[in-house]
């Protein structure tokens, strides 16, 4: 009953912030991607015949604030003690290939836009493996503040030879060599009216 309780703690923190935001708009930024997006990929490594377990969070976008855009590619509010595995370490230690690692530029518009989330792809380079994940904010996007727009949702996609499945959670789902896992973390909510955004900042966003 307490598994993945960090997701509940994160949402409680966010609930308080959202309730206070209309009354403290100069101190509280818009909503962020919120979820730790707990990621566990494991199995028996073909190279060593030893068990392997990749366990990490995913980073995402934070909400815009009164005087700045949201931060991009940071871990969630209740996740200060775990780390994203560097690409080189992940590929050396585990039977995976990191095929993509980039910003997800879908974030909430505003005078100060939300920060960007991330897209990270893992290609399974092992005869088989299993994946267990949890990502909240799959249905409800990060909220905008002071007339800012909503951010984007967290998504986990698994591509097999004949199918693509997108969910918020996977539990011991079987994978085979060549299957691809895509983690898409959401962008933060925007702060302030988007039409008040500085023209130079809009141009920078577009380029």
Give the label of every model feature segment.
Residues 1-207:
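Glycine/proline-enriched, intrinsically flexible loops and inter-domain linkers
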């Amino acid at each position: 009953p307490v598994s993945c309780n960090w997701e509940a703690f994160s949402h409680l923190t966010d609930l308080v912030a959202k309730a206070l935001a209309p009354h403290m708009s100069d101190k509280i930024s818009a909503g962020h991607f919120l979820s730790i997006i707990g990621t566990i990929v494991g199995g028996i490594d073909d190279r060593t015949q030893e068990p392997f377990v990749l366990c990490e969070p995913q980073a995402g976008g934070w909400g815009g604030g009164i005087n700045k855009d949201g931060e991009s590619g940071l871990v969630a509010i209740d996740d200060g003690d775990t780390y994203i595995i560097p690409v080189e370490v992940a590929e050396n230690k585990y039977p995976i290939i990191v095929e993509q690692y980039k910003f997800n530029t879908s974030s909430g518009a505003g005078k100060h836009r939300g920060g960007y989330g991330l897209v990270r792809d893992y290609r399974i380079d092992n005869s088989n493996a299993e994946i267990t994940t949890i990502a909240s904010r799959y249905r409800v996007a990060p909220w905008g503040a002071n007339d800012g727009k909503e951010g984007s949702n967290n998504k986990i996609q698994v591509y097999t030879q004949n199918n693509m499945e997108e969910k918020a959670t996977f539990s011991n789902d079987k994978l085979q060599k060549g299957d691809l896992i895509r983690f898409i973390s959401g962008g933060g909510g925007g702060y302030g009216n988007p039409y008040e955004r500085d023209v130079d900042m809009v141009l920078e966003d577009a380029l």
